[in-house]
Amino acid sequence: MKVHFIGAGPGDPDLITVRGKKFIMQSPICLYAGSLVPESLISDAPADAEVFDTASMTLDEIIEIMADAYDRDLSVARVHSGDPSLYGAIGEQMRQLRKRGIPFDVTPGVPAYAAAAAALETELTLPGVSQTLILTRTAMQSSEMPSDETLANFGRTRATLAIHLSIRNIQKIRTELEPFYGAECPAAIVYQASWPNQKVLRCTLATLPKKVRAAKITRTALILIGPVLGARDFKDSALYNPQHVHILRPKKS
């Protein structure tokens, strides 16, 4: 018996990993976050599997289901959206399982920011433009931010920002980042990346709030900000430059 924490990816069933799908097919018990994971992603669970939508459950209720499965020697597929290591709240679940001596493993998934970049047909790190991607969020009622993890501190880097779970703070994001990136800095909102109803909005930092309001987006959207989103005249990477010699491409005699 084992609890399998599975990253289901951003939403499209084709984007779950082979390993993640295998564990869902093999597990007699399946728990999934129904608010973020489409039911189609768990359709491969055994026909007689016990399936639970955890959207309305507490941590204790989730752990009790896992503990009961352990007592019955039944493996559990615990399906999270995106990659479970990022805003997946698996840390507290793993801590409880360790206390109880219940074995588990983690299967990574395609993260939302990767699906958003694919939808935008863009690279998030470009030579001479930005080589850093910051994954962050803003404070909400459910989660405070550590004191040093502020938009201003991140903005000073002028790195590419992927801001999660923060669409309701869109005006705050514009106000706090504009002094560092400038009003005309390219930005984008990707709503429900990879889902059938995906929306991709390109704009500038100054027009972010207006775009969000016009599209009536209130949740499940990723905000991307940074010069890479509009860069066209960037230099080529040295990776494929014939003058760049390395162990796999030695200097020609």
Residue ranges and their predicted role:
Residues 1, 12, 83-157, 201-202:
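Class I SAM-dependent methyltransferase SAM-binding "motif I" and its flanking Rossmann-like core
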Residues 32-34, 80, 137, 165, ...:
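Short beta-strand/turn micro-motifs composed of small residues
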Residues 21, 43, 68, 124-126, ...:
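Short secondary-structure boundary/capping segments
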Residues 34, 55, 108, 128, ...:
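Residues at the C-termini of beta-strands that transition into short coil/loop
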Residues 2-3, 61, 71-76, 132, ...:
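A contiguous loop/helix-start segment that scaffolds small-molecule binding in enzyme catalytic cores
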Residues 1-110, 115, 209, 221:
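Class I S-adenosyl-L-methionine
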